[in-house]
Amino acid sequence: MPPLHAGRPGPLLVLLAVTLAAAAATAVGASSDTAPFYPSAEEAAAAHCEGTLYPELCLSTLADIPDLHTKSLPDVICGTVNRTKDAVAATSYNCSHYINSKYLTPRDRLAISDCMELLDTTMDELQATTSDLESPAVAGGNNGSASMAAKRVTMDHVMTELSAAMTNQYTCLDGFDYKDGERVRHYMESSIHHVSRMVSNSLAMAKKLPGAGGETTQRQPFMGYGQMANGFPKWVRPGDRRLLQAPASSITPDAVVAKDGSGGYTTVSAAVAAAPANSNKRYVIHIKAGAYMENVEVGKSKKNLMFIGDGIGKTVIKASRNVVDGSTTFRSATVAVVGNNFLARDLTIENSAGPSKHQAVALRVGADLSAFYRCSFVGYQDTLYVHSLRQFFRECDIYGTIDFIFGNSAVVFQSCNLYARRPLPNQSNVYTAQGREDPNQNTGISIQKCKVAAASDLLAVQSSFKTYLGRPWKQYSRTVFMQSELDSVVNPAGWLEWSGNFALDTLYYGEYQNTGPGASTSNRVKWKGYRVITSASEASTFTVGNFIDGDVWLAGTSVPFTVGL
């Protein structure tokens, strides 16, 4: 979607152009995170709005902040985010009334309900952003006691939260992509786009702060994921890492789910509902072998939950919601996880709707610092929805056909198997469809040391179907395949257009040191945004350490990970 300022500049842009040079010349201060002196609020606004995608909106937003020229950049961003929260609240209020309209269909109401949930999540993420910006690590400036490492960790959170808040808005609008959905989308999109553009401006301003990555290319483009240790991002805590790697028999769960009644619960949903809300301690749910036919939602208050199964194909959570039968893609997930710090190991999650039902998600993840170890995800179109925030998958199997790994999280797959299945006649397979909408979002898909191949049902007929590594779902789509084994199922072109020339110049698709019969890049696409990566330093920015702050959080989960190349 083109930015608002495309075309002839408006009067506010003229003001920006006139005052920017003066603002740069007269601003006095030690750093960008302290409060420099600007002669006027207008010059301060021009300086702060430089580099935003929607400068007219930025200038009008900052015009409402009193004494703007005396405030530090974190204070200015907080002011912008607070005004964004007002816009979110107003949009949510309108949705709560509109959903009761007698002119809406059940599918309309479901899509609006998705928007209301996403707006609620957005409010939480914006609140977390202001809390981080007000923390000593950021608000203290370069003269504060916080180290640069602390600034980076905090700013990683800020950039991640803002990136997710923007993603939520596009997910809301995507929910109206059905016959007759355009009339409802038309009612919604003005206010939703307004929120998204305000978040975009905050994201652009936040990128100027120390620790946000703007001061060094070493943190780009996957800033925020973190370093690796012993096979996992460091944000996986040591205790959690042990839980992921220890024999299941050595772990004492907090709850047990069993189909035969031998546990405390017979459904996974009941065990999740009984788990404590907003817990700071890990809560382990052992799901015994069996097929659990249910849709499971791990809500935002269910933090620090862990699912332990009895093995891939033994513990199976299965359902069949799909778009053809009236669901939205967002709501079709067999398992949907929003509660942060979620872990899962040794189980299968499946959407059994089948290829004729089109979009049908097995797992949707919008939980920050979540990790999956030795799991399988089975479906056809849109199997794995890596929706937002930071995620890690290790030694997992993912099966699907069209766009079967998609979304806009910062996600790393290590030592996984990606299996393309037999699609419907005249269809092509696409492993990934990454959904980055803004050049400042710290999101993307990194696939490292994985196997990319055909599933058994496709193997014998793979010459009848084309299979591609990915296609650009959104304008700034970003995906990298590194050090992976690409089988002969991969089409020599490698990548597929979404629609004509859409995003071919703005996407970032890379390949680095892949092997196998499908790894040759000699006949790959010639798009401006595609590259064969030859530099180890460029490739390293897509590793767990630099992309998802994995060194900070994965260290505690017991999921093994590789920090670098």
Please tell me what each predicted stretch does.
Residues Y54, T61, A87-N94, L118-D132, ...:
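Amphipathic, well-ordered alpha-helical segments in soluble domains
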Residues H157, L162, M166-K179, V195, ...:
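Alpha-helical bundle protein-protein interaction modules that mediate dimerization/oligomerization
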Residues H48-E50, L57-L59, T171-L173, N417, ...:
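Sequence contexts marking disulfide-bonded cysteines in secreted/extracellular proteins
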Residues P2-A6, A30-E42, Y178-H193, V199-L565:
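Sequence-level preference for short, compositionally simple segments enriched
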Residues P9-P11, L62, D67, G141-N142, ...:
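Flavin-dependent oxidoreductase catalytic core characteristic
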Residues A27-P106:
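Extracellular secretory-pathway ectodomains and N-terminal mature segments of eukaryotic proteins
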Residues R8-A27:
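Cleavable N-terminal signal peptides of Sec/SRP-targeted secreted and luminal proteins
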Residues T70-L162, M166-Q169:
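Extended, amphipathic alpha-helical segments that serve as helical scaffolds
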